[in-house]
Amino acid sequence: MVQKNEHQGGQSQHSLFAAGPTGEERRRVQWLTAELERHNHLYHTLDRPEISDDQFDALFRELQDLETRWPELRSLHSPTLRVGGGLLEGLAKKAHSLQMYGLDNVFSAGQWQEFAERMARAWGGDVNGPLPESFWCDPKLDGLALEIIYADGVLQEALTRGDGEVGEVVTDAVRTIRTVPLRLAGPGPFPARLEVRGEVVMYKNDFAVLNEKQEALGLKTFANPRNAAAGTLRQLDTAIIGSRPLRFLAYSLGQALWTPAPVCLLQSEVMSRLREYGFLTPPDGRLCSSVAEVEEYAQWVREHRAAFPMEIDGAVAKLDNLEAQQALGFTARAPRFAVAFKFPAELAQTLLKDIEIQVGRTGVLTPVAMLEPVSVGGVMVSRATLHNEDEIRNRDVRVGDTVMVRRAGDVIPEVVGPVLEKRPENAREYVFPHTCPACGQPAYREEGEAAWRCENMACSAIRLRAITHFVSKAGLDIAGVGQKWIEQLVTSGRVQSPADLFTLTVQELLGFERMGEVLAHKFVDALARAVHSATLPRLISALGIRHVGEQTARTLALHFETLDELENAGAETLLSLPDVGPEVASSIHNFFNSPANREQLERFRALGLWPRGGRSGGGSSGSTGEGGLASGPLAGKNILFTGTLSMPRSEAEKLAETAGATPLGGVSKKLDYLVAGEKAGSKLEKAQALGVTVLTEEEFMTMLREAKAASE
């Protein structure tokens, strides 16, 4: 935080009239130092913040003011002299070759003007001439700071910022991030050593999808995209890291030994070079030619904040001239040539009218706050998640409270906490139900889990969610069979399980509201096509087995030829597979031991919905019927798509599946073909390094035609 420290005459007010700090001021500095260190640890190390950025900044400014007034109160471990938090013990540690500093903050146009004036004074215009007033500006990303080190264009090492001087080694994790070049793009020559600094983020839409998957699998959801990105990067299991949609956006350099590459003299040149080398950079960065233009840019970013694909919490301005940057240097914690415009958090106050329970497809009971509608970040919000019973208790949220609401990641509305000074006398503590609100059956909470679950798998709410999941993109992906139709069919009693869908007739559908003859025929045809085109991985995913998502379903389909084989697999066999742990193996065992599930599987078999996978390589029901192609160049092969294609990637994967191939989620030694479209990145490089056959989209289409011809 930047404050104007000078007073008229250049002397502190207190140096003239006070002998020293009061006892109260001493105690306040000690408390602020300890409290800020605690919050630093919670935020940077544990990713479990207890206060908002605005609250932290207010405490930080107060400590800075006191230390400026009484320098003798500043301790060697003051938070104003360091950046970030401590280090996790589970990761190796290494010193940065050059310290990774934080940024001082400004919160108004006046504070920005003061900062610019201080830069000019530090530059010494009388000796060095006027300070170059061009600034490179871009959005301030809210993620995890990272340094990636390249030697002669090849990725060597990656470190988190840590405490600024020593970071955590996360090289293997970073290699799984698709936006990180394993080898710099372009013909070269490349710098002998290049330390690329930037931020690991998760886009808001990706974050929403991840949390939906976590919730569907009964796993812990993340509070916001930053926590999701930080928690993922610190995972020790690279398979989990690689399955999550992290992105690295580069915005500066540490040490740069340019020879034999051309030298960059300006920050704007650095950004262009980073893009040439294959990095993503923060969107809408621009060169501003004056102090006033920088202020206009920061205001523009603030006004368009909601439109950015990732969370941002400000804008950054830094001198464009790198020589001037070097001349100005650093304070103990921040550069003198750069500053962050911090924006206030997007929060709103509203009335919590009630709390309702939503039942998920695996039976999870999720509390949902029913709110007086309020605009948060430009979006009207009337419902917000409260996550689970523990969160309600920990945040002391009561029905009738005025609560603070934010859009977590600018996507999912959540209740932050109550406004205690506005709490009415009749505010009611919420008692979490121990029975399911949909069916009235007992709920249970497993040891070590935060979620309560309905134990009645015949529950109407679970049934509705399960059938909706079965036809969704995470299941069989049956176009035209959406949730609204499922709700009507389930409510009517005609559809009580996924198998019932495939027995619907046009005549029956015509009896439903807004279902015309053309739509009814399309509905039935889509279900009929799904029987023949379904693949084993999609069917396994569609079944909704707890803890079994799309990637695990693919793994199972690679190792088992039919659902019969999967049902009969022993625990030892299951646990030998890469994505299967004790919980997953137990869930699979429990699913197939359920009489209701076994009955449904027999109905699928009778309908012809019984695809083959594993060693047969056919992948689809049609390998014994019309749709699948059990022979040809793609049969039994593992395939992956990367880059920009002429068709949606999901459509390309479907075509591959009908030709007998199995789409994978990442590059590995098991991959047979990589189909590379335009702007293919790190996947292409990794595949080439492993000797995987790389195809163009046209070559892939040729193989599809050959597969079709072989089946005729």
Curated annotation (Swiss-Prot):
Residues the entry annotates as binding NAD(+): 53-57, 138, 161, 199, 318, 342
Stored NCBIfam families: dnlj (TIGR00575), PRK07956.1 (NF005932)
Source domain of life: Bacteria
Residue spans of biased composition, Gly residues class: 614-630
Biological process annotations from GO: DNA repair; DNA replication
Gene3D superfamilies on file: 5' to 3' exonuclease, C-terminal subdomain (1.10.150.20), 6.20.10.30, BRCT domain (3.40.50.10190), DNA ligase/mRNA capping enzyme (3.30.470.30), Helix hairpin bin (1.10.287.610), Nucleic acid-binding proteins (2.40.50.140)
Name of the featured protein: DNA ligase
Active site, UniProt feature: 140 (n6-amp-lysine intermediate)
Family: Belongs to the NAD-dependent DNA ligase family. LigA subfamily.
One Pfam family hit: DNA_ligase_aden
EC number: 6.5.1.2
Role of this protein: DNA ligase that catalyzes the formation of phosphodiester linkages between 5'-phosphoryl and 3'-hydroxyl groups in double-stranded DNA using NAD as a coenzyme and as the energy source for the reaction. It is essential for DNA replication and repair of damaged DNA.
GO molecular function terms noted in the UniProt entry: DNA binding; DNA ligase (NAD+) activity; metal ion binding
Enzyme class of the recorded protein, top EC level: ligase
Chain positions covered by the region annotation Disordered: 1-22, 612-631
Keyword Zinc on entry: yes
Ranges of residues in domain BRCT: 629-712
Species the sequence originates in: Desulfovibrio desulfuricans (strain ATCC 27774 / DSM 6949 / MB)
Record field: catalytic activity: NAD(+) + (deoxyribonucleotide)n-3'-hydroxyl + 5'-phospho-(deoxyribonucleotide)m = (deoxyribonucleotide)n+m + AMP + beta-nicotinamide D-nucleotide
Binding residues for Zn(2+): 436, 439, 454, 459
